[in-house]
Amino acid sequence: KFDSLNILVLGGSQAARIFAEEFPQIFKKLKDSKIKIKIYQQCLNNQNKKLSQFFKSAQIDFEIFNFTSNIIDYYSKSNLVITRSGASVLGELVNFKIPFISIPLPTSADNHQYKNAIFYSKKGYGNFLEEKDIKDKLYDLIVSTFNDKSMTKGFLSNQRQHSDKDIFENLNYQIERILNEKN
């Protein structure tokens, strides 16, 4: 449902320092443009105070968290996720049917995050943005995702056509096969 933006920000295991540095001003600009927002932002422990102070002073509804083992709670509260481009998180978002903007870590091994972002974007599962373009393009990309209902519906439609259920069944079969071989 897109009458307001409930944005989940995930930065991977390192919580993406740049997300905590660059995103708050973009979120303030969203609020100032009269888009109703709530931010759920993963950050590092040493960023909690600064982010909390900023969001409070900007009167932005927010929840800051560090590592959590229950990310599903945040998925259920969100209608847009801004994340790094690890295969696991992008796969989870597709299976949870949540539109996303993936921002690949430019220093990832063999540039795998960039390749993941391109793959998922070409499939029509979400948008991607290079880290160097955050300041210039992220605000507009969020606004277009919010305003262009057909784009959002397209992402969700494409995500619905994808399922990893077969993967889990195959994984279960392989585990059982290995266990049976050992017995």
State where each predicted segment sits.
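A short, well-ordered alpha-helix in the C-terminal region of glycosyltransferases
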Residues: 151-165
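C-terminal "capping" alpha-helix adjacent to the active site of nucleotide-linked donor transferases
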Residues: 123, 127-150
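Donor-nucleotide binding loops and adjacent catalytic segments primarily
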Residues: 1-80, 114-117, 129-138
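Acidic donor-binding loop of glycosyltransferase active sites
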Residues: 60, 76-91, 98-99
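C-terminal alpha-helical cap of glycosyltransferases
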Residues: 164-183
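Short glycine/serine-rich donor-binding loops of glycosyltransferases
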Residues: 71, 89-93, 97, 102, ...
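Acidic, glycine-centered active-site loop in nucleotide-sugar glycosyltransferases
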Residues: 97, 114-126
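Short hydrophobic beta-strand element within catalytic cores of glycosyltransferases
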Residues: 83, 99-110
